[in-house]
Swiss-Prot record:
Its EC number is 2.7.1.170. It comes from Zymomonas mobilis subsp. mobilis (strain ATCC 31821 / ZM4 / CP4). Disulfide bonds: none annotated. Catalyzes the specific phosphorylation of 1,6-anhydro-N-acetylmuramic acid (anhMurNAc) with the simultaneous cleavage of the 1,6-anhydro ring, generating MurNAc-6-P. Is required for the utilization of anhMurNAc either imported from the medium or derived from its own cell wall murein, and thus plays a role in cell wall recycling. This is Anhydro-N-acetylmuramic acid kinase. Pathway: Amino-sugar metabolism; 1,6-anhydro-N-acetylmuramate degradation; Cell wall biogenesis; peptidoglycan recycling. It catalyses: 1,6-anhydro-N-acetyl-beta-muramate + ATP + H2O = N-acetyl-D-muramate 6-phosphate + ADP + H(+). The keyword Chaperone does not apply. ATP binds at G9, T10, S11, L12, D13, G14, V15, D16. One of its GO terms (biological process) is amino sugar metabolic process. It comes from the Bacteria. Signal peptide: none annotated. The keyword Translocase does not apply. Keywords: ATP-binding, Carbohydrate metabolism, Kinase, Nucleotide-binding, Transferase.
Amino acid sequence: MLAIGLMSGTSLDGVDVALIETNGEKQVKPLNFASYPYSDTDKACLREACRRALTMAAPCFIPEDEVIYQAEHIVTLRHIQAVKDFLKKNALGNQAIKVIGFHGQTIAHRPDLGWTWQIGDGAALAQATKISVVDDFRSHDVQAGGEGAPLLPIYHWALFSEASHPLAVLNLGGIANITWIGADENDLIACDTGPANGMIDDWVKAKTGLDYDESGLIASKGVVHHDLVDAMMSQKFFSQLPPKSLDRSDFSIEAVANLSIEDGAATLTAFTAESVARSLSFFPERPSKIIVAGGGRHNVTMMKMLHDSLKMPVQPIEDFHLNGDATEAEGFAYLAVRRVFNKPISFPKTTGVPHPMTGGRIHYI
């Protein structure tokens, strides 16, 4: 069946839209992809919503605080606009699409407190597009005692089920997460490994006003302060066994505050590489290769540091004729189809749930 997946990640770049054909098992055919950037005004509102959400004891729309209301309206509207434009440009009628997988925008992820919060009105999206929508993918997992993340390991398995195993798929978004893939769908281990683009973006934004370090050019001119990398790696998270997950706010740029822009970028990039390397020690067997998706694969300096730290092949997912910018959006299309068929999307070794379980709320049309 045809399904659309929507993703707006913690980097707050915009809305990614992907179209795939899948049966919710091994059959997956990515078909098309487009990205719709948020405006600077949208990004500012979403950042403030994230800041406020992290001060709360639980998800709660406070009547006198309009910021999160406004943020949810922005997220919903931008996703509606993106889907309608995508359908039009691809000459697709809404009847052709079985389901939309709508991740929403994470504004706080606190599995330690028993909750996670993705804003965006799935019912409104379904009504506006006249296509059934699956949203709220993470809550069921967290309520069952899981981490609620990462959720894409089963999609990574579908993409590489016929490849030589074991291998690992590394997604470099705001946060980095890794999936170790063994022989079958029950042989998956996954976790967040640490910050990826998020801290570097924050550093570059604070120092230059730019949104990110394009191609890792700033970092390439800097010197890595290994003592600071070691200090950041001493945090408890990095010695914890998977499954484990992070909120983008769990780490800050304070550790590199006294460095030059170049040295700070280099040190934070090395921190990402070292945290990924550390994660390999948790797997039962060293993977034969690391396949990289997500925006971080465009960072030449990060990819080189990963190769140097991991001492194994580190290949962009494009080497396998896939689009690394589309992988997350494709994944939520795939998860939506699995939800329609009531198939599990999270597993004990990927999120820590007690047994394989499905997730997501369906808004039927």
